């Protein structure tokens, strides 16, 4: 079980999701950052500077961050139960 959980953590740390042609890191720390930004931005079209998975900087909207967060969460959920199956 320990090995399976370790592998799961490794897979989660490598999650990358794509929204509007931009690739976002989707690991747990990145998901936390996305969630904080989504809460802090007041308007769906308000933008924030974001470092993408390839280390380029982009202006992203609240809507784009919400989509990236959802996709990353879905990817993590798909991975998370594997050690117990």
Give the residues covered by each predicted segment.
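A preference for well-ordered globular domain cores
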Residues: 1-85
